[in-house]
Amino acid sequence: MPGDFKGWHSRGFLQHFDSPERIQHLVFRTKDSLPSAVLAALPSDSRAKRRIVASWLDRGEGTAILLSAAVANIVQQTLLHFDGARYRLMAWCIMPNHVHAVMEPLDGFPVGSTVRGWKAISAASINRLNETSGPVWARDYFDRYARS
């Protein structure tokens, strides 16, 4: 595995696969998109966990800050900023409480670092716009690499 790419790894909640030039579907969500009671009751089975999380995300729970055109524009501009330099962004969809992105990481720029960058940069801008502080995004993200 070249550079800083980790292959299969986990920070305790979700398994991730990080590899250069491997197309990834990524989903990251706002901090308040899932009620804490739902998070606490998530099963350990990863397939069931993904199904429950997806169901709750589709409900648009939380403050749904991404419904704001100004906030959604911040997220979109953040996604586009390093397109072609650190990754190849193929598609994205900004939902009321989560974001989907399909991208291919370029050598030297692991997926985890890219997602952390997207979250940090967009959160700072969103907090500045809304005159708020604190976390905007949930800690983890979901990824699935495209199989050929």
Listing of model-derived features with the role each one plays in the protein:
Residues 1-148:
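Short catalytic/metal-binding and nucleic-acid-binding patches
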